[in-house]
Amino acid sequence: MSEENYMRIIDLRGRKLTRAEMLDAMPRAEMGTNEATELVQPILDDVKARGAAALRDFAEKFDHIRPENLRVPVEVMKAAVDELDPEVRAAIEESVRRSRAVSASQVPAPFHTDLAEGARVSERWIPVQRVGLYVPGGKAVYPSSVIMNVVPAQAAGVESLAIATPPSRNNADGLPDKTILATCSILGVDEVYAVGGAQAVAMFAYGAKGSEPQDGEILCDPVDKITGPGNIFVATAKRMVSGIVGIDAVAGPTEIAIIADGGANPSWLAADLIGQAEHDELAGSVLITDSEDIAAKVQEDLKYRVPRTEHAERVETSLRGRQSGIILTDGIEQSIDAANAYAAEHLEIQTADPDAVIAKIRNAGAIFRGPYSPVPLGDYMSGSNHVLPTSGTARFASGLGVHTFMKPVEVIEYDEQGLKTLAARVNAFAVSEDLPAHGESVLSRFIDDPYNKETIKEQEEQAGLR
């Protein structure tokens, strides 16, 4: 490990930046999306054409194991619950309880607006019928992501839930991690596939025919929407099938930003930056502060902590990467401007007056208020959702929630008098757009000959439309 500082300094002090310059100053990872697209397209095509046979081939190629059962038997998931460590099970069940409480409060209520006598517009929220939930594997296993995907979908009333998660080389039969399977069973999800990567996205988007007797004729039916985080290949595949199915977001590497003033605890700040860097070499860890003293103390604390953490090499790579850094500002207002430009997936506020800062934050996936609301709390057990927008997309997107799994549908309900009041104006609007048949559709309900343009106004007057 080097004695050099782990994080580069981005000094904004004394600089009056335009919006474009501020966005450009933010630390970001470089993503090879073009290369990923070239690799993903053949995977999508092959799964669409060959179904389960292609899924097994890709498992062997990428996961180095060929699962006998692509769909996990229900009895295996039930057995995984019985084998679960009691403390882990208690933690999972507490996380589920808190997530369900928050999700229940998010269910939108229908409403209606009466615009006039006989003129009503109402809105219904309808759950998506079938959803495919992706739970990543790789450097870690994420039973927490099962909870974050499944609980809001269930609260929304989704009828059919399917989960895909990579097969595990730690299991001789190629089944996924047992903690993930146990979590699925605890949540009552019995359609789980040992399929990872872009091929899982293809399976959800197109469905997959069986190739072995245990698959049945159809291994997996296509879904209406795909949610859940994943690596660049999963994210690219989701982007490429978007429009065929709905998606929640195209996720990039995970990230944290912390706004801290001179009163923050530098050891806690360092620990929180390391906690995010632990995810991935491309994870972004960003400290935004107007205190040069805090910045220096965090750098020193990192020198102590990084070599002692379990995944020190991964953490060091992340902290030294171009996607991480310490942003020095002139004051709290510039810190807020930088945070809004960065639009972090996770934004911690560790300042003397966190509420004043939060009031000015426009762009963040989730905000963690104060020193006792660290990001790992949200990762596992705060009740909030940890599937959040990354790579600056929090400027226009939000995290996963009940709304992700529902569609607002407007119901237009006018009676004869309600339509009659507007008929002439609808016709005038339609004619102005050179779409006269639109107006004729409405007028046909009240006059005999809407096609006679010479007498149209006279007919409207006789019908009481004017």
Question: Where in the sequence are the language-model features?
Answer:
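Conserved small-residue-rich beta-alpha loop and adjacent elements
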Residues: 113-182
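Short acidic-hydrophobic, aromatic-tinged amphipathic segments that line or gate anion-handling sites
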Residues: 6-14, 191-196, 326-331
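Conserved NAD(P)+-binding/catalytic subdomain of aldehyde/semialdehyde dehydrogenases
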Residues: 189-284
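C-terminal core of ALDH-fold dehydrogenases
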Residues: 341-465
